[in-house]
């Protein structure tokens, strides 16, 4: 059975509609940019409801509890490696400068015997939909398109 993740594509309206995307931490992702960002998401624990997992992961990855409104189900996508991601869109706000992600440990450098901690997310950014499509993992761009079907964009290039 494929691994399952759940996440929330947070959006806000300024001069234009913006969505919140996050960049994975750790050495594997350090020099990657285009097609490597994600919506805040993570694995659904056994017996956990996907929306509860999405809310938990949002808090863990950002290090903050966001007030969300206008929740909308954006469905599922299957990523290249087979993981199934379910997402919701929700209106909210967050200061990327306040990012305080949880961490994970791994051996680094490889075969060194040394374990290091890395943030699960090392950057967060508000971007317009066109930029989100460039930054996000390819399968996740569908969430941006689905969000735009239900949220009226505010004068911007889609």
Please tell me what each predicted stretch does.
Residues 116-122:
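Non-DNA-binding regulatory cores of transcription-related proteins
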Residues 32-34, 38, 50, 64, ...:
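Membrane-topology and secretion signals of cell-surface/extracellular proteins
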Residues 125, 129-158:
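Charged phosphate-binding loop/patch that engages nucleotide di/tri-phosphates or the phosphate backbone
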Residues 39-73, 128:
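The catalytic Nudix box helix
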């Amino acid at each position: 059975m494929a691994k399952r993740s759940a996440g929330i594509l947070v959006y806000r309206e300024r001069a234009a509609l913006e969505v919140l995307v996050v960049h994975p931490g750790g050495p594997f992702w350090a020099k990657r940019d285009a097609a490597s960002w994600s919506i805040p998401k993570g694995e659904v624990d056994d017996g956990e409801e996907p929306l509860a997992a999405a809310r938990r992961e949002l808090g863990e990855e950002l290090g903050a509890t966001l007030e969300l409104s206008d929740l909308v189900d954006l469905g599922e996508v299957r990523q290249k490696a087979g993981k199934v991601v379910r997402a919701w869109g929700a209106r909210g706000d967050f200061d990327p400068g306040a990012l305080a992600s949880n961490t994970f440990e791994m051996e680094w450098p490889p075969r060194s015997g040394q374990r290091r901690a890395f943030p699960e997310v090392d950057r967060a950014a508000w971007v317009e939909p066109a930029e989100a499509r460039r930054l996000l993992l390819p399968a996740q761009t569908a969430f941006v398109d689905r969000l735009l079907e239900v949220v009226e964009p505010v004068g911007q290039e889609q």
